[in-house]
């Protein structure tokens, strides 16, 4: 005999699907309204599978908001329940746990849970979001070949289901992968295509456009075309919304220093350093402090950079350790201090 659903159960299931759909598009205001309605309706739902799905989607909601402590706590509670999970709920559990690890910059752990989740995925329409996030995790883990493979897979599903937001995100990610392997022409083409995808004026599309501007800035920054980089980072910083504000602000500041626009660079340095302290973002507090010592307070460069590298080493931020250690190694090589240069070269490949 099939499961008999009440009108309330049917309405609630449809509401959960709407909730998940808006979260996949990062529409925070709509998700917040649906979260309140779901919380109110839950008490009238009698089917455990549906309630478990609601609990899992609540975890996903806190991941979207960046409330990782809450998401982790709810995940621990969910695991303690020892529930028997349907195929879809097993997929959500593995997938969302992977997302918690990803947001905490544990790329390999994220990949492990994403690969488990792939075994339970059943709907083709869901595969766009899944393969995009899998591709993003491979990119962060420094495996561009697998990132490109999965981003192309996600893009095929996005095209098939007319998921324009994800199509633009895939182009952005593919652009970054080509930038990573120094295929600048292809990277530029993909990033402009991603920018051209954004014709709407909703907040999600505007934020995606600002991400495209940031990545174009990064493309020119890496090629040391700093004047062009300034133009794109400036557009990213002044976009509303801008989910990557501190990152764009940091690169804008460094680009301005490099083209000798000192007073403007100092203006953005003050904004960035103050903002990072207000938000208690230690990663960017150190990044801005090290930038200041590199271009302004050069007498304290060595000491502050050594402390900064030690900080990034302590939090296992391998990308930052590699980047700053390589800079220090080159610096000491030019000074003829071979022992210190060798130390930082070794640290760069740690």
Question: Residue ranges of each PLM-predicted region?
Answer:
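Amphipathic alpha-helical segments of tetratricopeptide repeats
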Residues: 36-43, 75-83, 111-120, 152-163, ...
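Structural motif corresponding to the intra-repeat A-B loop/turn of tetratricopeptide repeats
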Residues: 25, 65, 104, 141, ...
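C-terminal structural cap/anchor segments
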Residues: 257-294
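Loop-centered beta-sheet repeat module
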Residues: 148, 152-219
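Long, mid-chain structured domain cores
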Residues: 49, 56-149, 153-154
């Amino acid at each position: 005999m099939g499961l008999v659903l009440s009108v309330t159960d049917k309405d609630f299931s449809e509401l959960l699907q709407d909730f998940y759909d808006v979260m996949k598009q990062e529409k925070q205001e709509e998700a917040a309204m649906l979260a309140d309605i779901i919380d109110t309706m839950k008490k009238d739902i009698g089917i455990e599978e549906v309630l478990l799905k609601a609990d899992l989607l609540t975890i996903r909601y806190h991941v979207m908001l960046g409330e990782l402590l809450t998401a982790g706590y709810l995940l621990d509670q969910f695991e303690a329940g020892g529930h028997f999970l349907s195929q879809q709920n097993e997929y959500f559990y593995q997938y969302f746990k992977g997302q918690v690890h990803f947001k905490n910059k544990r790329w390999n752990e994220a990949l492990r849970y994403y690969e488990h989740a792939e075994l339970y995925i059943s709907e083709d329409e869901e595969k766009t979001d899944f393969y995009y996030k899998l591709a993003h995790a491979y990119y962060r883990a420094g495996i561009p070949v697998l990132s490109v493979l999965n981003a192309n897979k996600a893009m095929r599903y996005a095209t098939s289901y007319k998921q324009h937001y994800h199509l633009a995100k895939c182009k952005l990610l593919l652009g970054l992968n080509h930038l990573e392997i120094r295929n600048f022409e292809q990277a530029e083409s993909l990033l402009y295509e991603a920018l051209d995808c954004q014709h709407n004026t909703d907040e999600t599309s505007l934020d995606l456009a600002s991400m495209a501007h940031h990545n174009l800035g990064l493309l020119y920054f890496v090629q040391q075309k700093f004047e062009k980089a300034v133009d794109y980072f400036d557009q990213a910083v002044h976009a509303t919304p801008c989910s990557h504000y501190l990152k764009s602000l940091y690169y804008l500041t460094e680009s301005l220093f490099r083209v000798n626009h000192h007073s403007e660079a100092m203006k953005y340095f003050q904004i960035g350093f103050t903002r990072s302290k207000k938000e208690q973002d230690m990663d960017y507090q150190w990044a801005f402090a090290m930038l200041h010592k590199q271009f302004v307070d050069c007498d304290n460069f060595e000491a502050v950079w050594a402390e900064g590298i030690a900080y990034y080493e302590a939090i296992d931020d391998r990308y930052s350790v590699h980047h700053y250690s390589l800079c220090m190694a080159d610096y000491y090589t030019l000074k003829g201090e071979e022992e210190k240069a060798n130390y930082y070269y070794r640290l760069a490949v740690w």
